[in-house]
Amino acid sequence: MSEGESKSTHFGYKTVEVDKKAELVAGVFHSVAAKYDIMNDVMSFGIHRFWKRYTIEVSGARPGMKVLDLAGGTGDLTAKFSHLVGDKGEVVLADINDSMLKVGRTKLRDKGIVNNVSYVQANAEALPFPDNHFDIITIAFGLRNVTDKDAALRSMNRVLKPGGKLLVLEFSKPQHEIMRKVYDLYSFKVLPKMGELITKDADSYEYLAESIRMHPDQDTLKQMMVDAGFEQVDYTNMTDGIVALHRGYKF
């Protein structure tokens, strides 16, 4: 690549300049923030609650721990972690998108969750936290939207304490051909129509379907985590691999 030539990346199936992707992703989430929780329930038939509950169960969160809920959006995981870490613990709900962060803050405060939760607008590629700060980091359905995933994983590793755990919950690749066919049909034909009906925004849900297909598969993401410095990395497929939970440790 010659000097001055723009580097490119993907935004769904489109090729865009690297410095434009964050702005485009921001536009998607500004558009859907107000109806994000409703769409999650509708498009996953409520199964996202099971995926998130399993993530919480394997997190090992205990009273007094510091947890970073990265790309935490409307705060589903933060709400659970707040209860688990208690008054002596701390949960940081971080998201690059201020619209999502505002929805999350309002939702949690309306539930009376205020004492041990703070809110930070942050870019996963350059987290504004000290080294070795958190016991647990989660990023649920957010990594695929990050422009430089390798940089983000290294940043997470930096702010995680030795002995700490990273949990990456993300859409992945179905394991069986019949499921792949059904999933593709649903994603590209049904999902955008749901988006249009509920949020008046079909394009954002077309991007969702495309971004899932462009995201690294289970084994590729596992190796990316290893390359970023995580150890004992493994993953669990859920719903035939439509979603996978990756786990890695910092020692």
UniProtKB/Swiss-Prot annotation:
Quickly give the catalysed reaction. a 2-demethylmenaquinol + S-adenosyl-L-methionine = a menaquinol + S-adenosyl-L-homocysteine + H(+); a 2-methoxy-6-(all-trans-polyprenyl)benzene-1,4-diol + S-adenosyl-L-methionine = a 5-methoxy-2-methyl-3-(all-trans-polyprenyl)benzene-1,4-diol + S-adenosyl-L-homocysteine + H(+)
Pathways per UniProt: Quinol/quinone metabolism; menaquinone biosynthesis; menaquinol from 1,4-dihydroxy-2-naphthoate: step 2/2; Cofactor biosynthesis; ubiquinone biosynthesis
Binding residue positions for S-adenosyl-L-methionine: T74, D95, N123, A124
Q: What class of enzyme is it?
A: transferase
One example of a Gene Ontology biological process annotation: methylation
Domain of life (superkingdom): Bacteria
Query: Does the keyword field hold S-adenosyl-L-methionine?
Result: yes
Describe the function of this protein.
Answer: Methyltransferase required for the conversion of demethylmenaquinol (DMKH2) to menaquinol (MKH2) and the conversion of 2-polyprenyl-6-methoxy-1,4-benzoquinol (DDMQH2) to 2-polyprenyl-3-methyl-6-methoxy-1,4-benzoquinol (DMQH2).
Q: What is this protein called?
A: Ubiquinone/menaquinone biosynthesis C-methyltransferase UbiE
Q: Which organism is it from?
A: Shewanella baltica (strain OS223)
